[in-house]
Amino acid sequence: MAWALLLGWPLSTLAATAECSQGLLQRLGWRFETAAITTPQVQGGPVCTRASLAEAQAAGDLRVRWPGTLAAADRQALLQQLLDDPATVCAYAFELGAAVQRATQALQDNESFRFTGVQLGWIGFGARGAPAQGWQRVRSFGRGYVPAASNSRALDAFYTGHVRAECGVGRQVAQLATQRELYGDAAFDAEFAPAELSIGTFLGLHDTDSILLGAQAGQFMADGKAVRTSAMGRQAFVGLPAFIEHVFDKGTLDDLSNQAENFVVVEVGEGAAQALAEHGGLAWYDQRNRALWQLAQGIPRVGQRYFERLLYERDPALRAQLAPRYRDVVQQMDQLLDDPFYQQFVIYAHPRGIRPVGYHIIRLLDRNPRTPFSIDLALHNLHTTLYRRWREAQLRHCAATGRPGSLTLDPN
């Protein structure tokens, strides 16, 4: 049917569509070469394993050679295939990664976006209330809100306003802020209806039009232990929602506010990516987390943030005070934590900001010492529905402006 539709389009429409499609692909890093060949040759390459787009191109990824005699309909069909190609989704991940970094840095920089303190509801907008900061309440006890005016103004509440929320809302906001940074404010305001940007309890989002978990989320990817994602490479992790959760039952929890940590992945270093691929995902690190927890059981905690100071900050004075019988244990813990995954798998978790995942595993030894913790990726649609929506928005932008290769994020 797709072929029939293509063949039925006027030539001028095909040409315009092809120009916009090729322009977007080139903006994402594809290079096209006309050659004396009879059929197109496509080299996508393992783009998600690369540190940067420049590295991918230098390795020969994202290259197309096609005949100059290729018919317009065939050309458009090939371009459409490339838009759906896994290598293109990985190239898009570089744009996504830059957006994640801008979004999470902005959220981290707002000292008035907090977790602790007395809240009147699940999300607290302070004395001025939600409407003054661009949000409208749709559920009682602060459990659900949608943007009241422009989407970008609503997110400004978390960039520069005074808001209190727990880490689950922090993750939702980071995910939505990433879309804002990916589109640019004008397109972000135009693309999404207010209900699509609902925030609140995770359970409540399922009954909304949320693009994260509701009716507009579309096609989810489920890879809890990151088996497939680890095989794809480091860029496949960027922007993904995930969580750290207690392994034993709630009866072992001493600090309920730290029973879990919700986060988005900001960056994955080369060593961390190699380790995840070698070990087949996160299950291996659940075992390492338990080993760390077991070793910690034999060391008495002294003062606040004891393990954080001992193992993350590696405070020399604190280490000097260790009784000789504990030094070998601490050395074993150091060796486990020196794994690149703990050092280079960088996440954003509200209100802790941008830190390596090892920091969080260590701090939870202090907060909830009677249970180990596990790490899982959450359901997500970054590489499916949200990628396709962004792609179509860029193609519409090209058609409206007549500027192939331009993005909605670009200055006018």
Model-found features: residue ranges?
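Bacterial N-terminal signal peptides
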Residues: 1-12
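Boundary at the C-terminal end of the N-terminal hydrophobic targeting segment
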Residues: 13-18
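Cationic-aromatic interfacial patches
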Residues: 21-83
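Active-site nucleophile-His-acid catalytic modules used for acyl/amide transfer and hydrolysis
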Residues: 123, 127-130, 135-161
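Active-site nucleophilic cysteine motif
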Residues: 156-178
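Low-complexity, highly charged intrinsically disordered N-terminal segments
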Residues: 179-184
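...with weaker cross-activation on analogous glycine-rich loops/strands in unrelated enzymes
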Residues: 198-273
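Low-complexity, Gly/Ser/Thr/Pro-rich intrinsically disordered linker/tail segments
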Residues: 282, 287-412
